Amino acid sequence: MVRETRLDLNPSSLTKRNHVIDTQTPPDSLPLSLVQDTLTPPLLPTQPDSPPPVSSFPIQPPISVDLQANHTPQYVIAVAEKCDLFTGDWIPDSSGPAYTNESCHEIENHQNCMRNGRPDSDYLYWRWNPRDCGLPRFNPERFLDLMRNKSWAFIGDSISRNHVQSLLCILSQVEQAVEVYHDEEYRSKIWRFPSYNFILSVIWTPFLVKAAIFEDINGVSTSEIQLYLDELDKKWTEKYKSLDYVVIAGGKWFLKTAIYHENNTISGCHYCPGKNLTELGFDYAYRKALQLVLKFITGSDNKAFVLFRTTTPDHFENGEWFSGGVCNRTAPFKGEIDMKDVDAIMHEIELEEVEKVTAMAAENGIVLKLLDTTRLSMLRPDGHPGPYRQFQPFAKAKNATVQNDCLHWCLPGPIDSWNDLVMEIIVNSGPNQ
């Protein structure tokens, strides 16, 4: 039976021990041409009036998640060995982004919000500011100098690709990368910066573990995903030994309907009514997958510098991806906000599992740091393409019903601040300190 992927994250559908959610996440970004329209109007208008800063705290997790409000893992505080980079405020920034959709040609059409006709621009004039220290803007010249003769990979789903494109755009102000490889679907790519002999890549592996996926680029599936929770995806493990730096992340693919395999047998599933299988829940699979990933990293002979990026919140309102959800806000959140149950669950699993292996990684000579972008990203509902994942979506009718993307990020946009954090962490940790 052919079924559309659907996302229904109603908290009432969660149970405390086995989180049963009738949910399938948005399809991955389509492999579209990277060539941009040279007739695009200038991107950056006059900066808006300066509103007050927007705080990252308090974020109140749902009661059902049982998060410990006073529990702050020590590695979060020490991530840059100076301050907690992830507690802070979004403050007005009149300088705007470091690049435009005219100066960077690595922006996928789905994230090229201004080209696609997004009418507002205030979301471009904010930057992340940690409470206890300054966060310099990304320095592309210094970054490329540090990365001479190095290899770097972003490993994960389409959010990782969104992230690497932000980095490529920032670095393009110094040197244009040369694409030297892409897979058939344009999901995994490799670029080279010739003057620096720096290799940058993105490896598409939405589960990090082995998976059989029967889904087209529009998110239509012909069968349930078969997920092998005790076997890593060779697409990234076979390349791992050649990498000097890694940004790795899980994601919302774990919310999709899936059959779980362990020890050469089916162990259960997530949301598989009528299959006569044990409902284990997405949280079971996510924890098992992360444990396997982190065991591989901490036990590897390759002493890479590894950043584990935490889950990315979406901002769908009045529905989800396939049920009419929208994101039409034009400013960051202010005051208290609640994290969706699924985001809070995934985030807590990430914090717990990374904390368990941080000391072991250090003993083995591996730098493992947390890149906790979840809470700061939660405050930016204004940063998504929304209906402007498509070119001029309302050209034919102002009230047209169009697909909204409230998961990925506009480029330029809030995701660029993730790279400010990356730069600060690598400069203040390990051999670059």
Labelled PLM ranges:
Residues 1-433:
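A compositional signature for long Ser/Thr(±Pro)-rich, low-complexity
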